[in-house]
Amino acid sequence: MEDVVVKQGFLYLQQQQTFGKKWRRFGAALYGGSGCALARLELQEGSEKSRRGEAPRRVIRLNDCLRVSEASGEASSPRDTSTFFLETTERLYLLAAPTAERGDWIQAICLLAFPGRRKELSGLEGKGGRPRMEENELYSSTTAGTPQKEFAVTVRPTEVSERCRLRGSYTLRVGESALELWGGPESGTQLYEWPYRFLRRFGRDKVTFSFEAGRRCVSGEGNFEFETRQGNEIFLALEEAISAQKNAAPPGPQTQPVPVPAVLPRPESPYARPHDSLPPPSPTVPVPTPRQQRGLEGEYAVPFDAVARSLGKSLRGVLAVPPQLPADPLYDSIEDHPPPRPDHIYDEPEGMAALALYDSPQEPRGEAWRRQATADRDSSGLKHGYIVGQDFAASGWPQGTEYDNVVLKKGPK
């Protein structure tokens, strides 16, 4: 497959010799990239020798190009020519082209060396103006330690590279958010990209750069290996891009914490509630505990006897013993009755009465047989006797009493 020639003509190259600098004329041919070759600028000395293939050939790879700019300050250029700089990672070239063709050469070289600026340069070409080339500060050689962004690599056969049908040389570009692989039959065609967040790991040595892609990548998961002597530069550029992406990531929206209620709300009951029932208290509003309403305090001090009376009532309720019914006695009490209490002529003042914890006991009234016996006496006052063994029957005497041998005597009072 023949390489596509983008532009062809002649250029002057300034070379350093023993006794100073000298311009030499070369036949120049600008080739675009393909699946088997990279974009390059080839310089051959002498037109007749180049036809026979005997002339030495100098190749400048455009994937190593850092900047292309005009060099208007160079006054020692050949007649009817204008100079421009072509800087690569290896050296700085000072070239001279016919004044009318210098802009075309610069634009053609930039289109192949910097595919990302193809739209910008095409717009300038459509307007008919010459592109104004300025020094690229990002790739400037004056900035020490600045890693490159595009690198020429050759794919090593692996399982995943065979599945993706990748063979030969390509351009590996370190983008802002993904690692990109450019190449193919048409120059400037992006084949694959691997976002940084989907790369599991990456590494390098003196002649190899490799990385492991995750299963969320377009190519699928697997290890990719590339032959290159710029493995360390690719590694540094990739580290810098990942760090920049982390720092530039916008912070996510701050979520306000949702307050969790102390008590979950009660679900609405599917059944009707009686109209006279009170609604349940709100779980969030504390229900005040009802307190016992105190009586209205008087404007004056409470008398001490009233305090004693209330205290006595409270003690009476605590110490009171439930009243027990008196049992029927076998013998009636014949003792004298307790003297009656004196009747008071005047009522006692309120609050001065003695506190009575217990009521006065009442005498039992089981005296029916005594009253009956008193009614059976005769007027003479004689005593009746009861003879043992003799059936005694008297009118009015209760029959079947428990004690039959009791003799009543009337004693002196």
UniProtKB/Swiss-Prot annotation:
Secretion signal, residue range per the UniProt entry: none
PTM comment: On immunoreceptor stimulation, phosphorylated on C-terminal tyrosine residues. Phosphorylation on Tyr-346 is required for binding to the SH2 domain of NCK. Phosphorylation on both Tyr-271 and Tyr-300 is required for interaction with RASGAP. Phosphorylated on tyrosine residues by TEK/TIE2.
GO molecular function: transmembrane receptor protein tyrosine kinase adaptor activity
Record's keyword terms, sorted: Phosphoprotein
Any Pfam family hit: IRS
Pro residues biased stretches: 250-268, 277-289
Domain PH: 4-114
A biological process term (GO) from this entry: Ras protein signal transduction
Domain of life per record: Eukaryota
Biased composition (Basic and acidic residues): 362-381
Domain IRS-type PTB: 147-252
Region (Disordered) residue spans: 247-292, 362-383
Cellular component annotations (GO), alphabetically ordered: cytoplasm; plasma membrane
Modification type Phosphotyrosine: residues: Y271, Y300, Y346
CDD domains assigned: PTB_DOK1_DOK2_DOK3
PANTHER family for this protein: DOCKING PROTEIN 2 (PTHR21258:SF14), DOCKING PROTEIN RELATED (PTHR21258)
Comment field on protein domains: PTB domain mediates receptor interaction.
Known function: DOK proteins are enzymatically inert adaptor or scaffolding proteins. They provide a docking platform for the assembly of multimolecular signaling complexes. DOK2 may modulate the cellular proliferation induced by IL-4, as well as IL-2 and IL-3. May be involved in modulating Bcr-Abl signaling. Attenuates EGF-stimulated MAP kinase activation.
Record note on quaternary structure: Interacts with phosphorylated RASGAP and EGFR. Interacts with RET and NCK. Interacts (via PH domain) with TEK/TIE2 (tyrosine phosphorylated).
Family under the similarity heading: Belongs to the DOK family. Type A subfamily.
Name of the molecule in the record: Docking protein 2
Naturally occurring in which organism (per UniProt): Bos taurus
